[in-house]
Amino acid sequence: MKYDVAVIGGGVVGALISRELSKYDVKAAVLERCNDIAMGTTKANSAIVHGGFDAVSGTVKAKLNVEGTAIMPKLCKELNVPYRNNGSLVVAFSEKEMEHVHLLYDRGIKNGVPELEIIDSKRLHELEPNISDEAVGALYSKSAGIVLSLIYI
């Protein structure tokens, strides 16, 4: 059989590419090296929909992280897949680690990440009451969330 497009990988990204290709008059084949879908990166992922603050500014990854996070709630609704916009935290346990939090914040702002803030220990404990008292602060990305990736595919 001949195909117009080969999609490499049957994880979340491959599934979304295949879904998009299904809107066009093309024959597509999904090539997966494992014996089932979602056995690679998707399986190892914690199902987080990243806010986009960690990718190097100016890269395609940075752009797609932010765009992907923005479309995920609508896409999950269309696919009837559970999605929770619970945000994400990068927690610091020292002032040295807070320097890294500030770096991630600056990068996130450059990347166009919405609802990104640096929070102090008090606010962190309001969000996560059981977190260690040694935590000094965090980067809080309100736009991040989680999705049930195996249902998603």
What residue spans do the PLM features occupy?
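Proline-glycine-enriched beta-turn/loop adjacent to the NAD(P) cofactor-binding site
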Residues: G11, C34, A47
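The feature captures the short pre-catalytic strand/loop hairpin that immediately precedes
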Residues: D133
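Glycine-rich "substrate-gating" loop/helix at the edge of Rossmann-like oxidoreductase active sites
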Residues: S141-V147
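Conserved small/polar residues in nucleotide/adenosyl-binding loops
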Residues: Y152-I153
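N-terminal Rossmann-like FAD-binding beta1-loop-alpha1 element of flavoenzymes
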Residues: Y3-V30
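Glycine-rich FAD pyrophosphate-binding loop
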Residues: S22-A44
